[in-house]
Amino acid sequence: MQTQERYDRIEQLIRDRGWEKAAAQIQKEIDNAGMLCLSENCDNARMWESYADGGRGVCLEFLAWDDAGLTFFGLHSFNITYSDSREYNLLRDPWEQAKTIVLTKSPEWSYENEWRIVLRNRLGQCTVGNILFPPEFLTRLIFGKNVDEVTKVAVRKWIRAGRCRPALYQVQSIGPIFSMTQID
């Protein structure tokens, strides 16, 4: 569907049945997209507590871009905007509206320094589940401070069986000063 057709369709929806139909179209765009959330930093105690099961998880570090300046996610990477303001124009393209919604968070979350990879479902493409990436883009794997040996052995086995060769690190301390050491 061409952009102008979308605008025309949204304008007609607003005229016919109000904003509910326009909001439903925006929600449909969100429902048909896949999203991966990433952070710029690995040394935040709050994030280790919340997202890594109190330090019992791992952190994967990906190369942000290669020598040519390309990310393995291409144009699908977006930096989160932290703002209390969320303005929507229901006459805009539904996909652009959907991106505004999923790429804006309250300022209280700004410590996350979050990026999101948003994959739009086009022509029946899968946007959920396992997404392949070039192995060279996984540069580091960091074991949380409280990861058990069984998990470490399993992760090392998976790495040996695959094509990724990230550097392995172990978190030593999370707070008040973050520290980690390379282990392999």
Q: Language-model features: where?
A:
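Partner-binding and oligomerization surfaces adjacent to conserved cores of proteins
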Residues: 1-184
